[in-house]
Regions:
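Conserved core of the sugar-phosphate nucleotidyltransferase
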Residues: 132-196
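Glycine-rich N-terminal loop/short-helix segment of MobA-like nucleotidyltransferase
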Residues: 1-28, 44
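Short glycine-enriched, charge-decorated loop/helix-capping segments at active-site entrances
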Residues: 20-26, 96-100, 170
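Conserved N-terminal catalytic core of the sugar/cofactor nucleotidyltransferase
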Residues: 2-7, 31-123, 130-131, 135, ...
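Active-site metal-binding loops of divalent metal-dependent hydrolases
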Residues: 12, 127-128, 160
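Residues that form or immediately flank small-molecule/cofactor binding pockets and catalytic motifs
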Residues: 28, 85-88, 188-191
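Short beta-strand/turn micro-motifs composed of small residues
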Residues: 9, 27, 53, 125, ...
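Conserved beta-strand segments of alpha/beta enzyme cores
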Residues: 22, 79-81, 182
């Protein structure tokens, strides 16, 4: 069964002086975090990659990663597609409040994929590293998807202290679960720092 990896890469990048933070080199040969995530996902069995970006960063994004990844993936039989997050893309019956200038975030980003994704999929942030094991577990879960159980969902959660940076405060989604281990909410929390 085909499985897709959706990579949210539309971040404004204000922490990087207005640049595209997802394109910052971290590896010894200029690799970016997405290179590692895409490699791990393909190794785990994902065969479609969908980048969620903004129209205004499309050219820079494709120059920095998209075109290169498309060439690599073409030789591996992995499909590449793009979805575009835009402020005005809201569900039918809704409108953008007057004065709002920024897109809505994760939910709206995933909504941008409507019509592009037909297969089971996983969603990741472009600038977070998840590790091979997370992609293997997600792919294995998605392989068990059946259309008669469309509500089957999974989340690769991480212990908060293991996701903190040595280089200052971070923002994380703190997941809340009920007694049956179902996700009941996500609280976006800013300014989280390691303590001694």
């Amino acid at each position: 069964m085909k499985t897709a990896l959706v990579i949210m890469a539309a971040g404004i990048g204000s922490r990087f002086g207005g640049g595209i933070k997802q394109l910052a080199a971290v590896g010894p040969n200029g690799e970016i975090i997405m290179d590692y995530s895409i490699h791990d996902a393909i190794e785990a069995g994902f065969d479609k990659i969908v980048f969620i970006i903004r129209h205004d960063i499309e050219e820079a994004f494709k120059e920095a990663i998209g075109d290169r990844i498309e060439k690599i993936c073409a030789g591996l039989g992995v499909e590449i597609d793009y979805a575009f997050q835009a402020l005005e893309n809201v569900p039918e019956g809704f409108s953008v409040p007057e004065g709002r200038s920024k897109p809505w975030g994760t939910g709206q980003a995933v909504l941008a994929c409507k019509g592009i994704i037909k297969e089971p999929f996983a969603v990741i942030n472009a600038d977070d590293y998840y590790g091979k094991e997370a992609f293997v577990r997600l792919h294995d879960f998605l392989q068990g998807y059946t259309p008669d159980k469309p509500g089957d969902l999974a989340m690769a959660g991480f212990v908060l202290k293991n996701t903190l940076s040595d280089n200052g405060a971070v923002t994380r989604g703190i997941c809340q679960m009920n007694d049956a281990h179902y996700l009941t909410g996500v609280l976006e929390t800013s300014g989280i720092e390691k303590t001694a």
